[in-house]
């Protein structure tokens, strides 16, 4: 597993455990959707900032950055869900 994915997952657990008021399941789905959207937008912005030339290789690299950003967002959202469950078990 990628080191950044593990860090993202652990940060999600900490965020879910420490932040209050996320017990509503619709809110968790909204957080997951927003996380995926932010991952996509940040991936596109990062690829635009990093890749200057226009060619097929750069497009493949940009697509890879977008996919990586989405995967990190999914790990963060999963960690948030797990942190929320841990917070409920503590109560």
Curated annotation (Swiss-Prot):
GO terms for cellular component: plasma membrane. The keyword Transmembrane applies. It is found in: Cell membrane. The chain crosses the membrane at residues 4-21, 28-50, 60-82. It comes from the Archaea. Keywords: Cell membrane, Membrane, Transmembrane, Transmembrane helix. It is a multi-pass membrane protein. This is Uncharacterized protein AF_0891. It comes from Archaeoglobus fulgidus (strain ATCC 49558 / DSM 4304 / JCM 9628 / NBRC 100126 / VC-16).
């Amino acid at each position: 597993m990628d080191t950044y994915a593990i860090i993202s997952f652990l940060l999600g657990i900490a965020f879910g455990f420490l932040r209050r008021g996320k017990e509503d399941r619709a809110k968790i789905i909204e957080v997951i959707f927003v996380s995926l959207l932010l991952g996509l937008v940040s991936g596109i912005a990062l690829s635009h900032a990093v890749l200057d030339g226009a060619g097929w290789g750069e497009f493949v690299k940009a697509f890879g950055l977008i996919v990586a950003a989405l995967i990190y967002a999914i790990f963060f959202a999963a960690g948030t869900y797990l942190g929320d469950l841990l917070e409920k078990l503590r109560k």
